[in-house]
Amino acid sequence: MKNNYSEANIKILKGLDAVKKRPGMYIGSTDSRGFHHLLWEILDNCVDEVLSGFANTIAVVLHAENQITVSDNGRGIPFETHSDSKISTIDTVFTYLHAGGKFDNDSYKIAGGLHGVGASVVNALSDQLQVTVKRQGKVYRSVYENGGKIKQKAHCIGNAKIDEHGTSVTFRPDPKVFKKIHFDSELIRARLKELAFLFKKLQLTFVDETGSGEKEVFFTEAGISQYLDELNADSKQIAQKIFVSGTEDDIELEAVFQFIDGEDEKLLSFANSIRTSEGGSHEASFRQSVGDVINNYCRKYNFLKERDKNFEASEIREGLNGIIKVNLPEKIIAFEGQTKSKLFSKEVKAVVQKLTQKHFFQFLERNSVDAKLIVEKLFYNRKLRQELKQQRQIKKNLSNPKAERILFGKLAPAQSKKVAERELFVVEGDSAGGTAKMGRDRFLQAILPLRGKVLNVEKINNKKEAINNEELLTLIFCIGTGIGNNFTIRDRKYDKIIIMTDADNDGAHIQILLLTFFYRYMKPLIEKGHIYLALPPLYKFEGRDKKARYLWTEQELEQYRAKHSHFNVQRYKGLGEMNADQLWETTMNPMTRKLIQVKLDNFIQAEKQINVFMGDKTELRKSWIEANINFSSEN
């Protein structure tokens, strides 16, 4: 490092250069979530027009070559020359950071876009972007390239009908910023469907030109009540839905929640239509208010005696499913960072508290049968938690005798003392487990073979059954975080937990059993990106040169067959068919292996998949595995 630190070392990033230099500061990451975030930003700008009452249709079209168009029938971006920038307002919005109508309290009373930087950030991180505006009987267009450089400044390209208005943005993420760009049509559908739930009678359309090309329409009459019905579709409801709505101090709240027969809490929250996946002030106030109402009601009607403790938050949250939607004035809305995953606005707390307590207490007073069923469930939760005291010991380290006894002879630990370096391979069977133990990097990689049958946790009644299953209990001890409400992610003993199974139907079934367990009892491991699937090769290919090549797909095999006239092909039926060196080289070596990181991008879709995977209908599970997982067959 040079010691001559002077004014020459200080760089001033002009225009959109700051975004290009540090894209993660603005969109969170440059992986698939990053380029999808660009789409969400443009979509959020359309939604802002809906929130303000100026638009009722939004259209998304996915084109070839990773181009995508988002249109609305809102007011349209003004095209007149801006007084400060001295260029068209369209070009100002798309080439200046912190330029937009959201800094003017009159233009957008409520908005969810990225505080005036969304459009320009998308432009900065796209290699092509085109804006078309219909407004005041004119059609204007601007074209940009190479990260926001003006190719064609805003200019009139024709006339529009006087009642035609709106904005259309077509862009392509910059391949120099994002690797392996591929828009996920299912993810886009899920977001459009979510918006249809959030805004009654808003029409959203989607056309996937890379697929069927058919127009899909998303529209609801009942809004978030319909959303909760879908969330609870496969659950047994304890009581009817509870509705909360009202406006205080220009803050609008709409919420619907329901208690179901289950142990998980499923609470989805939104602020100005933005999904706040990490919660925030609105979610915290809602939870606190629900708990206060329940305890006050139980005291008033003597369900809780004087000697009884109040219900704890963790007891109340088990089986509580709900949707919370708040709309806040732009002047007070505050998110954590630019990606808006957590709401910080303090003003929302009192409003949510007042309205939730009022409506929920009225519901309990007016619906005594439902109230009694809810209270009975809470007492059941309390009784179950008392029976699960042994589970609290799971969070303790592996020095306790029970853990040592359970793990003895099973776990081959990693030697590194640093959690960030350690990997745990959860391996199907003793045979593959033994090979993995011989082939691994002993310093960084731990091996845990699964010897018995993994429990399908979707078919059990409570956590007690999960921790009585030896294979799951071993896994719980090994990971070290605890489960359910006693889960603490900072106690994890590994940074990567890698499921390594055979590439066949049985292997896929074991993967799904384990993923179901992680989803139900250790969900933050998935949310924080710590769960992976190993991808062992399907084939070993040797040509005339006798050099071994490992192939992962049927397509790769066909390509090699076309290039070689003489060859031998071995189809790996299981991990145990590879020796230790081969398993290391193909599946475990961080420099050469292929891993799939398990992600949770859509809550309801995940719920539905889990129910397909692990519910009572085995024919659904079998057909899904056969349709969606390609194991390739021997020829």
Curated annotation (Swiss-Prot):
Binding site for ATP: Y5, N45, D72, G113, L114, H115, G116, V117, G118, A119, K340
Binding site residues for Mg(2+) 2: D502, D504
InterPro entries: DNA_gyrase_B_C (IPR002288), HATPase_C_sf (IPR036890), ParE_type2 (IPR005740), Ribosomal_Su5_D2-typ_SF (IPR020568), Ribsml_uS5_D2-typ_fold_subgr (IPR014721), Topo_IIA (IPR001241), Topo_IIA-like_dom_sf (IPR013760), Topo_IIA_B (IPR000565)
Taxonomic superkingdom: Bacteria
Catalytic activity: ATP-dependent breakage, passage and rejoining of double-stranded DNA
Function: Topoisomerase IV is essential for chromosome segregation. It relaxes supercoiled DNA. Performs the decatenation events required during the replication of a circular DNA molecule.
Name of the protein described by the UniProt record: DNA topoisomerase 4 subunit B
Organism classification: Bacteria, Bacillati, Mycoplasmatota, Mycoplasmoidales, Mycoplasmoidaceae
Gene behind this protein: parE
